[in-house]
């Protein structure tokens, strides 16, 4: 019996496994709640989230647990050697999505596999983390860090661009956010870091100037201030030119990027800055989500008793806005407990990154930490109205087999690293 239990339990840090199990149980409890029958006259005009959603997720949980066990037991060298083949296979799958993937709500994000639908972009995150850890880990000594950084940027951009064309803006941003986390841990040059941060600021200011204020002067003023700072710093002409050129390119690129966004994506971003413009349209999700979380208070309305959820005011309550259900029914204490579990998982990943001896393993652990950090922070920020709605799930919690399986792969990699943390 003990031997059988050992085979059905993943190797590695038991604390990570317990955190994973608690998060999955949390998910199933919330999904059971959102699949309860709706009540009220308004709800009769809405569609229930069927109980099959819960039972499908149970099946995915079983498959994900098996995946967790397998990945935690694989040789670390094998994972490193397979990073390129896995990455290339995922790129092929992403290309297939655009060619033969079924179109749902104007986008192609899935591949039909019998009765199931898989979302290759979710597995692309795992593949990219593996490959970036391999690429950067083999370039920690000798050679140019700038060259290694630019090469890693290309490896992250390829799947990000393919996903953006589906279109799926939220998921494409995950690739870049994880890349930033890993490249920061790797040791990005100060020049590249300043260039990236200032260019990001330039893009945001240009968007706000053009789309919200409809005045060009804030962005022009920003460029003048930047040029003054560069002059006072007395840096090299090449470095100053790189920073200024990147800022101008980022700002001028915003109108081009905006033109390629889908109309619903544009509406969501505009509604974020001005919710009163369309309270019952594009801003509806964010408004109802904030109402749900706010009505929960400290202790919540109690499990299965959420009114925003039960009356169907809260859309996408089983997927992107499941955190709102936790906030409404379980209150600040319940939602806070959920966030603490994620925090413990991320902190453990960072601990592993500092304990392991191989650069590949350290970068891989940081990739896992970056993945969960970005997903959780952005999803919670969306549900609380701090960011525009982008359709990013809460890992291990939201309904969806592909995301659950991909997130379980990430946890499996972390467990594997905890086993081999003292290997050379």
Question: Residue ranges of each PLM-predicted region?
Answer:
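Gly/Ser/Thr-rich beta-alpha loop segments that engage phosphate groups in nucleotides
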Residues: 29, 103, 108, 172, ...
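A juxtamembrane structural motif centered on a specific transmembrane helix
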Residues: 1-3, 378-424
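Hydrophobic alpha-helical transmembrane segments of multi-pass inner membrane proteins, especially
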Residues: 17-25, 29-32, 39-281, 327-384, ...
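TM-adjacent membrane-interface loops and short helices in multi-pass inner/ER membrane proteins
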Residues: 271-319, 330-334
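Cytosolic juxtamembrane amphipathic/interface segments immediately preceding
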Residues: 1-9, 47
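Helix-boundary and loop/linker segments of multi-pass membrane transporters
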Residues: 8-10, 148-149, 311-314, 356-357
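Interfacial segments of multi-pass membrane proteins
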Residues: 173, 178-192, 308-330, 393-394, ...
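N-terminal export and membrane-targeting signals
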Residues: 11-15
């Amino acid at each position: 019996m003990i031997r059988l239990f050992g085979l059905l339990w993943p190797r590695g840090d038991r604390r990570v496994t317990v955190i994973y199990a608690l998060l999955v149980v949390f998910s199933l409890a919330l999904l059971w709640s959102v699949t309860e029958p709706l009540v009220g006259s308004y709800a009769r005009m809405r569609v229930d989230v069927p109980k099959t959603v819960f039972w499908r997720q149970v099946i995915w949980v079983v498959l994900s647990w098996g995946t967790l066990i397998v990945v935690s037991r694989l040789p670390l060298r094998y994972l490193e050697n397979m990073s390129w083949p896995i990455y290339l296979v995922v790129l092929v799958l992403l290309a297939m999505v655009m060619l033969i993937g079924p179109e749902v709500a104007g986008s192609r994000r899935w591949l039909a596999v019998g009765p199931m639908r898989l979302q290759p972009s979710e597995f692309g995150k795992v593949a990219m983390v593996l490959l970036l850890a391999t690429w950067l880990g083999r370039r920690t000594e000798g050679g140019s860090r700038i060259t290694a950084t630019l090469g890693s940027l290309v490896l992250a951009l390829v799947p990000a661009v393919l996903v953006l064309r589906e279109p799926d803006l939220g998921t494409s941003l995950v690739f870049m956010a994880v890349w930033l986390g890993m490249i920061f841990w790797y040791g990005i040059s100060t020049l590249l870091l300043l260039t990236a941060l200032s260019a990001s600021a330039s893009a945001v200011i240009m968007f706000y100037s053009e789309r919200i204020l409809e005045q060009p002067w804030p962005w022009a003023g920003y460029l003048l201030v930047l040029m003054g700072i560069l002059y006072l710093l007395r840096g090299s002409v090449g470095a100053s030119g790189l920073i200024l050129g990147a800022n101008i390119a980022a700002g001028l690129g915003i109108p081009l990027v905006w033109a390629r966004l889908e109309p619903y994506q544009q509406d969501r971003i505009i509604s974020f800055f001005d919710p009163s413009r369309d309270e019952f349209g594009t801003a509806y999700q964010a408004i109802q989500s904030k109402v749900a979380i706010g009505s929960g208070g400290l202790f919540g309305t109690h499990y299965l008793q959420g009114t925003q959820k039960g009356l169907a005011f809260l859309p996408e309550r089983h997927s992107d806005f499941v955190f709102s259900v936790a906030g409404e029914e379980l209150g600040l204490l319940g939602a806070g407990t959920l966030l603490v579990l994620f925090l413990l998982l991320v902190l453990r990943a960072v601990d592993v990154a500092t304990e392991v001896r191989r650069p590949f393993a350290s970068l891989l652990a940081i990739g896992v930490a970056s993945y969960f950090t970005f997903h959780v922070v952005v999803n919670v920020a969306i549900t609380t109205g701090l960011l525009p709605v982008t359709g990013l799930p809460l890992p291990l919690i939201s309904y969806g087999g592909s995301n659950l399986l991909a997130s379980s792969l990430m946890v499996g990699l972390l467990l594997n690293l905890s086993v081999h943390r003292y290997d050379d």
